């Protein structure tokens, strides 16, 4: 697998681009998560960035990537509606792992948005999507542009939802390479990694949360619920950051 040129790959017809990515993904599937990170740092173009929601398993990918690239910018899109425990978790991990945290927010404050649009998350799928565009998608796009990102690491896993079940290790998203080193990990592997390296789950894990986002669109897990149903009232799984 030789070094990839982002501009050249972006310029290819979609069929040729897909074929090139499929070829390298066939090889990346057989590598460990650590080997995938190493391969990306050697073969994909910098600038490198890592995004994190500082959710339940966030410490895994943050530790995995920063062990090999300690100063990598870690992008957080802060909606202003995260749980207090999430902000405390962010502070704790930033100090413990010495993260190069880069926080991006919507151009309008939460209070201003509510004054202008009302509580968008209570306005069905359309309202949730508008909320996500304002508070997550636009800030992430701005982060990638501001940081000059060409390769983006993220901690998604296929096991998390149906919408992620077929994601490849490597893709092109928002015009940059996107690499998912732990895409094929299961919950057991996550637990083993955290335990092995003295890392913790998000504090709300012990209170019954399987997935953590904003306070107003996150629910505790209850018997009979899927993980997907604990977010956005079960109306959708993705917040827009990881949708093509």
Swiss-Prot record:
Localization, UniProt: Cytoplasm
Chief location bin: cytoplasm
Keyword Ribonucleoprotein: no
Active site location: 239
Gene Ontology terms: biological process: hydrogen sulfide biosynthetic process; sulfate assimilation, phosphoadenylyl sulfate reduction by phosphoadenylyl-sulfate reductase (thioredoxin)
Alphabetized GO MF terms: phosphoadenylyl-sulfate reductase (thioredoxin) activity
Signal peptide segment: none
Enzyme Commission number, as recorded: 1.8.4.8
Recorded catalytic activity of this chain's protein: [thioredoxin]-disulfide + sulfite + adenosine 3',5'-bisphosphate + 2 H(+) = [thioredoxin]-dithiol + 3'-phosphoadenylyl sulfate
Keyword presence, rRNA-binding: no
Enzyme class: oxidoreductase
Cellular component annotations (GO), alphabetically ordered: cytoplasm
Pathway annotation: Sulfur metabolism; hydrogen sulfide biosynthesis; sulfite from sulfate: step 3/3
HAMAP family hit by this protein: CysH (MF_00063)
Recorded family membership: Belongs to the PAPS reductase family. CysH subfamily.
Protein name: Phosphoadenosine 5'-phosphosulfate reductase
Annotated source species: Yersinia enterocolitica serotype O:8 / biotype 1B (strain NCTC 13174 / 8081)
